[in-house]
Amino acid sequence: MPKLVTWMNNQRVGELTKLANGAHTFKYAPEWLASRYARPLSLSLPLQRGNITSDAVFNFFDNLLPDSPIVRDRIVKRYHAKSRQPFDLLSEIGRDSVGAVTLIPEDETVTCPIMAWEKLTEARLEEVLTAYKADIPLGMIREENDFRISVAGAQEKTALLRIGNDWCIPKGITPTTHIIKLPIGEIRQPNATLDLSQSVDNEYYCLLLAKELGLNVPDAEIIKAGRVRALAVKRFDRRWNTERTVLLRLPQEDMCQTFGLPSSVKYESDGGPGIAQIMAFLMGSSEALKDRYDFMKFQVFQWLIGATDGHAKNFSVFIQAGGSYRLTPFYDIISAFPVLGGTGIHISDLKLAMGLNASKGKKTAIDKXYPRHFXATAKVLKFPEVXMHEILXDFARMIPAALDNVKNSLPXDFPEXVVTAVETNVLRLHGRLSPEYXXK
């Protein structure tokens, strides 16, 4: 039976096996179980001897891959993978994935040193960023057969290595430092069309605003190559060693992986975890008080900016030695306000991915949510009332200046339509905070 050897920073963690019936099993290596660095690959796959055969194995590895069936088909076509199954796809592109996981076929030897790369010219960078238009997955252009990466999510993206001011393609098992996200474009739905052609600017703006309001988010910059604009987001699951000679991978996983769930149920409405489940899980964090506070603060922020995609795969935890864990920075933040006014899109259609508690059931409609719903949610979760009021009061006090500061920091060619759409609606919802909380 074929096996994929699983590594974390050059330490053998275990083996992923695909059985004849297509089932996936995982077994931790004895040397990993005995190591002082030992930690579970996933909190849904506790350290243990013997084969793990639960559905969590398939789901964990499947969640390392792009969500889009189209992108998965491109991977099959590009590398002649045997199927769309996680084992077969990761056999081809598992050298650099989310967190610290590196997957290498047991019969394959990686000859490149730990850190090796090829510097990209601007023309070459543009080729990588536009590869999806030629049906090439994740920027893995045909001339670079040693460039094998996996990036989860639904958006067109790739991952690259930044060395100084240069963008580089990593070689062998060299990690990447940045996720590069392309404009989403138009999304056609049965009754509506979402114009997300300015998603790069949208996400950049939202990240700046989040940082201005004290939320922990990654650094990002807009990059240009030829006629392409993209968002380069610094990976928080990567860190240089003290000498800056080796780039380390930091173990992490998203909440679908944590709960052993497939990505198909990442939304609460589809059966995925909501605020209550994640807040209960964060009680076990090594920084429980901070993580629970930050998570609730981020729920308010998502409401204020009209962020509708805060599902389980967009929240993650670092996995530390021994199996302790803590919340990662927040990521994949985009406002739906700039798409309002498009074909069939109204503010009444915008819904939070995770519902708030209300007098009757859950409140998800952004335009129908008020501070009282956050207070009610906090009460149900036994989150301190004083902490919830502090969060709301801080937003009431900080929002106007934060909006001004972000606007003043933007480049001259930044699309005004994005700023105006987000600002106008944030201030409108901010008005619901002010009477009750601005003076507190």
From Swiss-Prot:
The keyword Lipoprotein does not apply. It catalyses: L-seryl-[protein] + ATP = O-phospho-L-seryl-[protein] + ADP + H(+); L-threonyl-[protein] + ATP = O-phospho-L-threonyl-[protein] + ADP + H(+). Disruption phenotype: Deletion of the hipB-hipA operon has no effect on virulence in mouse infection; the disrupted strain is as virulent as wild-type. The modification Phosphoserine is found at residue 150. The active site is at residue 309. GO terms for molecular function: ATP binding; protein serine kinase activity; protein serine/threonine kinase activity. Pfam families: Couple_hipA, HipA_C. Autophosphorylates intermolecularly on Ser-150; phosphorylated form not seen to bind ATP and no longer has kinase activity. It is an enzyme of class 2 (transferase). Forms a HipA(2)HipB(2) heterotetramer which can interact with DNA. Belongs to the HipA Ser/Thr kinase family. PANTHER family: SERINE/THREONINE-PROTEIN KINASE TOXIN HIPA, SERINE_THREONINE-PROTEIN KINASE TOXIN HIPA. This is Serine/threonine-protein kinase toxin HipA. The gene is hipA.
